[in-house]
Amino acid sequence: MNLIFTCGGTAGHINPAIAVANMMKERFPDCRILFIGASGHMEEKLVPQAGYELKCLPGSGLSRGKNLAALKQNIHAVRCVLNAVKACKRIFREFQPDAVIGTGGYASFPALQAAQSMGIPTCVHESNALPGLTTKLAANKADKVLVAFEESVPYYKHPERVEVVGMPVRREFIFTDKEQARKKLGLDSRPLVVSAFGSNGAKVMNETVAGLFRLEKEAGFPFRHIHATGRFGWEWMPDLVRSQGVDPDAEESIDLREYIYDMANVMSAADVIISRAGASTCNEIGACGIPCILIPSPNVTNNHQEKNARMLADHEAAVLILEKDCTPQKLYDEITALLSDGPRQEQMRRRLREMVRLDAAERICDIVEALCKR
């Protein structure tokens, strides 16, 4: 069996594909797997680290603007897509895939388009309740459209091809032991807080966390804190933290990283997670059952992150803070209130696990296997 996974841009598109690829490899050890993504993005780090071959093609996303710069950007994007489709066809003729699986991001469109034009079975997975542009375009000719939420089904032209499967997460998010995870990180007895705001980072939230570090220092560092700056915050955030009176190189209570590559282990060790509210992140948090504070990005299409966060908050499975309301003091107060309330933490763990489908990767594998047998 030969499978191609296509995804890219952010970890939210890449990690679900890796979760399914891992499950397929468990079932079929001889299965050949190839990933196709876009040059210059997170897939160049995450996919090889997961042990899979990756081919990256030049790509560019579409602009939703209406000015001349946006027009030029979109002309460039279309040219990139056309060239990438040709490149994918060459790859397919050599690799001979039995199916192509897309998990979102503009990087996945050329491979899906090429596969559909060559009669290769395709399957797309959409993690958000409202489908993204790539999913909308690819879904019309896809053999199977897999969604995380029942509410998503009416948005597709061919509902008979749509199946609700949930959101795939890697098995290590489900089965990693908390005490073993803490031991691996060398933690002391203090609680662990983990904060991350997407693989690219978020300037506003990095600034807020820098202020939060100052409050933690003033309180005598009552908890350990691991923070991921993201790709665009790594160069400048350490200096900002120093300006708050905290030396990130010398202070052992804080651990500043560009990206948390061992997220399953770090998340499993955590007592509180602070993050955005992308569907992939919410499901990973749910699989671990870790009390969380969600600060949805206000800069995403259809405001889908706030909808994700409100759904969890309405079920008392998360604390929701809008970015515009999130100050260092408010965030510190929410963290300490949560850490001091054991019954509330336990309730959040229970509610989170109730809302997550832990068999999503297995269900997707069943569907992919059936496609390959056609």
Q: What kind of feature is each model-predicted range?
A:
Residues R344-L358:
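A short, well-ordered alpha-helix in the C-terminal region of glycosyltransferases
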Residues A87-V100, S108-C123, K136-K141:
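Glycosyltransferases and closely related glycan-assembly transferases
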Residues R32-L34, E53, Q116-K178:
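Active-site-proximal region of nucleotide-activated glycan assembly enzymes
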